[in-house]
From Swiss-Prot:
It comes from Scheffersomyces stipitis (strain ATCC 58785 / CBS 6054 / NBRC 10063 / NRRL Y-11545). SUPFAM superfamilies: Histone-fold. Transmembrane segments: none annotated. There is a cross-link at K125 (Glycyl lysine isopeptide (Lys-Gly) (interchain with G-Cter in ubiquitin)). There is a cross-link at K8, K9, K18, K19 (Glycyl lysine isopeptide (Lys-Gly) (interchain with G-Cter in SUMO)). Residues 1-20 have a biased composition (Basic and acidic residues). Monoubiquitinated to form H2BK123ub1. H2BK123ub1 gives a specific tag for epigenetic transcriptional activation and is also prerequisite for H3K4me and H3K79me formation. H2BK123ub1 also modulates the formation of double-strand breaks during meiosis and is a prerequisite for DNA-damage checkpoint activation. It holds the Pfam family Histone. One of its GO terms (molecular function) is protein heterodimerization activity. This is Histone H2B.2. The modification N6-acetyllysine is found at K8, K9, K13, K18.
Length: 131
């Protein structure tokens, strides 16, 4: 048997009691202050690209989290592959050449071609701006 249902009573509208504010000493607040750790994400950049391609489309927090994880994963794969390539060639520095080769190895076909051309364009733009 199911337990009998309790009768619903309207919530009372009485104001909540105000408690006196606790006095804080300078030493106790300084010891408990914590700086909020910053979480670095690509959210603002993903949002800008979304608005360039689809101005009237939004993105949910969960979808943004998935996109952020995707970007982190791709960057990690490229960096790892570029690191291996530098080690094979007995170099201690990852250059644009290693990144380009890593992109060609990781991304498939046409996507790799577009990524390489956009990357080359970005590096050229950066180089001309810094001169």
């Amino acid at each position: 048997m199911a337990p009998p249902k309790a009768e619903k009573k309207p919530a009372s509208k009485a104001p909540a009691e105000k408690k006196p504010a606790a006095k804080k000493t300078a030493s106790s607040t300084d010891a408990k202050k914590r700086t909020k750790t910053r979480k670095e994400t690509y959210s603002s950049y993903i949002y800008k690209v979304l608005k360039q391609t689809h101005p009237d489309t939004g993105i949910s927090q969960k979808a943004m989290s998935i996109m952020n994880s995707f970007v982190n994963d791709i960057f990690e794969r490229i960096a790892s592959e570029a690191s291996k390539l530098a080690a094979y060639n007995k170099k201690s520095t990852i250059s644009a050449r290693e990144i380009q080769t890593a992109v060609r190895l990781i991304l498939p076909g046409e996507l790799a071609k577009h990524a390489v051309s956009e990357g080359t364009r970005a590096v050229t733009k950066y180089s001309s701006a810094s001169n």
